[in-house]
């Protein structure tokens, strides 16, 4: 057996039914116990994005913290991941992506609430938080907290944080603009170095500018394609729903599609895209300027909504409208490139996808640098931060030259490992989550003067 085949077997085991059920089951439990908070309070959560928490303590604004999380979350999964999910499981995979995103919003709310509640100030005066802190301070299990932090550093160094993103950037630039991989790799590495050596505030500043711009550009282009093909939209949505339960209803009666394959593809890629339950977003949420854990939890859960319900849905619908998903000669980013070119009737569509992929992947690199750094500091202290950042920058450059299949196998393994300690903590601290939520909304109800503020 080769190393790649051994790692592939480990990957299949980690991302098998137990983890998928645990992730979805945790989301379902929290959804029910919190009274469908992700639906009832989504308008309030979206409103909080643009309102400061007066007197809140933290390093960056709640909006900047969300953008840092979105920078790490919105990446190649929104373009390449959706395409691979629909090709593997049919259009029905999009339906299961919607479902896992809906449940994942409750999970994201819970983990980011805990991040603010159990955060601390480090020796440099910065806010530090995330699963490692609420596992240690909430559950009192320090070895499990250290295990999570170790997995977090591994993901940043060898997983979704670096290798898949820079590989996607360099090869997309070569395919679309004929720019050599080495040239793009050097430029990306230098840009990443300039930003991350400035620390969390520089990452947050860059993310606050890049993330909204790239998301608006990508979604606007998708909407243009949808409007140009508006007469096909009802049939496309019906196909997505029908093939979720009857894959043979898919265009062309795609051979080998099953309900289980649609579910597995949609759930796995949905979670891979929005990261709900993996424990990454809480690390960014802990830096937010806020007094209220619940308030930040509400803000953070909008990240899953924006990532999957909005951005991934746009990709999925365009793939179905144009029929690109059912072309066996296409794979990965080329599927989405083809879909957007067909949808707009010009090669400009493919260019927009490549530019979107460039920005999405670049900001994912920035966001994961911060996540890995917080985990690294938890393990060894603040003194090794500069060494960590230099190592991260060098690994970014390396990712352009590694074999693509091996990159994604390693990324899947370490990304999946992060989820287990975090989900154990969410289940173990479920009473804290429920009590904090009830307390916040009770205080909000009795404050008749300002419904956006609560009284202590």
Swiss-Prot record:
Compartment(s) where it occurs, according to its Swiss-Prot or TrEMBL record: Cell inner membrane
Cellular component GO terms held in the UniProt record: plasma membrane
Keywords from the UniProt entry: Cell inner membrane, Cell membrane, Membrane, Symport, Transmembrane, Transmembrane helix, Transport
Topological type in the membrane: Multi-pass membrane protein
Gene3D superfamilies: Amino acid/polyamine transporter I (1.20.1740.10)
Family matches, as InterPro entries: Na/Ala_symport
Family: Belongs to the alanine or glycine:cation symporter (AGCS) (TC 2.A.25) family.
UniProt name for this protein: Uncharacterized transporter HI_0883
Organism taxonomic ancestry: Bacteria, Pseudomonadati, Pseudomonadota, Gammaproteobacteria, Pasteurellales
